[in-house]
Swiss-Prot record:
Gene: rplW
PANTHER family: 60S RIBOSOMAL PROTEIN L23A (PTHR11620)
Family affiliation: Belongs to the universal ribosomal protein uL23 family.
Keywords: Ribonucleoprotein, Ribosomal protein, RNA-binding, rRNA-binding
Pfam family for this entry, one: Ribosomal_L23
Name used for this protein in its record: Large ribosomal subunit protein uL23
Organism: Neisseria meningitidis serogroup A / serotype 4A (strain DSM 15465 / Z2491)
Any one of the GO CC terms: ribonucleoprotein complex
């Protein structure tokens, strides 16, 4: 299943760093990422394996609806966000700080 390398590098937008994501990383070996809205689970799995060099056990996705916010008199709406919870295979470890430092050196 040959996926486009360029597409895979664009699928993952950013890691999500929150209290919940830190607990998941420590207890369940899961990483949380913000991904493109039209990204599929196989694409997300392939992208994480390509970019970080780790084995992925499974991917769970959830689309969070954007909140309605007021801007003065007008009502605006924040964008919907798709999150991917990526479970790493047993024995695999992903250090985002080290991965970011390695990417900066290239």
């Amino acid at each position: 299943m040959g996926m486009n390398q360029q597409r895979l590098t664009q699928v993952i937008l950013a890691p999500i760093v929150s209290e919940k994501s830190n607990v998941l990383a420590e207890k369940r070996n899961q990483m949380t990422f913000k991904v493109l809205a039209n990204a599929t689970k196989p694409e997300i799995k392939a992208a994480v394996e390509l970019l970080f060099g780790v084995q992925v056990a499974s991917v769970t996705t959830v689309t969070t609806k954007g909140k309605t916010k007021r801007f003065g008199r007008t009502l605006g709406r924040r964008s919907d966000v798709k999150k991917a919870y990526v479970s790493l295979a047993a024995g695999q470890e992903l250090d985002l700080e080290a991965a970011a430092a390695a990417a900066d050196k290239e």
